[in-house]
Design a protein with these regions (language model features):
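Conserved pre-ATP/AMP-binding loop-to-beta segment of ANL
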Residues: 116-135, 142, 165-171
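ATP-dependent adenylate-forming carboxylate-activation enzymes
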Residues: 9-12, 32-33, 53-69, 80-85, ...
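ANL superfamily adenylate-forming
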Residues: 81-127, 232
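Conserved AMP-binding A3 loop
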Residues: 2-4, 131-158
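Conserved AMP-binding/adenylate-forming
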Residues: 14-62
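Gly/Ser/Thr-rich phosphate-binding loop
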Residues: 216-221, 230-290, 303, 310
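Conserved AMP-binding/adenylation subdomain of ANL enzymes
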Residues: 154-171, 179-218, 232-234
Length: 313
């Protein structure tokens, strides 16, 4: 898919959301599987000034009830198999409706979008307008919605593309889910902001990754991606000859994984650290020593303070 086509699809989706009564500043919850239409929906919300609210596809009715009450969405975009369940949940909410993303020809968002013009939709938003509400993992209590502004997104990706040397010549291998910061913000934005290319996989599959690595220059993943790749005998320095950077985050990586991957691929993985509330915060260097077991130094314009349980430095 070309960038022109991507813009056309996103614009059609924005107009379809308009037709469903969504206005700038309204929240749009999306609990959908990773797919190209899910990317179109996300970009449509950014372009049109809607607030995108991605949810983990594993969440059940109890969690969804909390998110609906907390986010107060205008629209809940879901899948065919969950439509009836979600419809019942949103009935209790004020002024909220449910729609299927794909899979219900003539009535789903994909079908509604197809009936609209492909003329580019670009609406004026302020830098401090909320672009996305992304819910935290809830490790210390009930999951909370972090309000991420358009400025947050732009400033973070500017730093990352500079730090990690992204350019239009790159091809990112994207096998991450898109309901959290890593896959939705970091991976997508690093590519789209510089006009690079992307190999888009709907889920991680070792054989598919092995087949596509020769076409990629960058891969982002979580530690389990790399341990699973190490289980495949085809992972070699020759296979990875075109890759310039492997990035890992979202969880700590064992030193053994680091060392084995470097031996097998010829590449030292770059670890970094981020949060739902702040995006990326620290990173090991692109040039220079990447220390195993660390997440590097604070990014430019980021301050880090280490405190104890009593918030004392």
């Amino acid at each position: 898919i070309l960038y022109r086509e991507l813009d056309q699809h996103a614009s059609r989706y924005a107009l379809a959301l308009d037709a469903l009564g969504v206005c700038p500043g309204d929240r749009v919850i999306a609990q959908v599987d990773k797919s190209l239409p899910s990317l179109f929906l996300y970009l449509a919300c950014l372009k049109a000034g809607y607030i995108f609210v991605p949810l983990n596809t594993a969440y059940k009715s109890k969690e969804l009830t909390h998110f609906i009450a907390d986010a107060e969405p205008k629209l809940f975009v879901t899948s065919c198999d969950r439509y009836d369940e979600v419809s019942e949940l949103v009935m209790a909410a004020n002024d909220c409706s449910a729609v299927i993303l794909v899979g219900d020809p003539g009535r789903d968002l994909l079908g509604l979008a197809a009936g609209h013009s492909s003329s580019s939709v670009v609406r004026s938003v302020k830098s401090d307008d909320v672009a996305v509400i992304i819910y935290t993992s809830g490790t210390t209590g009930r999951s909370k919605g972090a309000m991420v502004t358009h400025h947050n997104l732009v400033s973070n990706v500017k730093v990352l593309t500079s730090l990690w040397r992204f350019s239009e010549h790159d091809t990112l291998l994207h096998a991450l889910p898109v309901f959290h910061v890593h896959g939705l913000f970091v991976a997508n934005h690093c590519v789209l902001s510089v006009g690079a290319s992307m190999l888009w996989l709907e889920r991680f599959d070792v054989d598919a990754i092995i087949d596509l690595i020769p076409e990629a220059t960058v891969m982002m993943g979580v530690p389990t991606f790399y341990t699973r790749l190490l289980s495949n005998e085809k992972l070699t320095t020759e296979l990875c000859r075109n890759v310039r950077l492997f990035i890992s985050g979202s969880a700590p990586m064992l030193s053994e994984t680091h060392e084995l991957f470097e031996q097998r691929s010829g590449h030292r993985i770059l670890e970094r650290y981020g949060m739902s509330e702040a995006g990326m915060i620290t990173s090991n260097p692109y040039d220079g020593e990447r220390k195993v077991g660390t997440v590097g130094m604070p990014l430019p314009s980021v301050s880090v303070r280490i405190v104890d349980d009593f918030d004392i430095s």
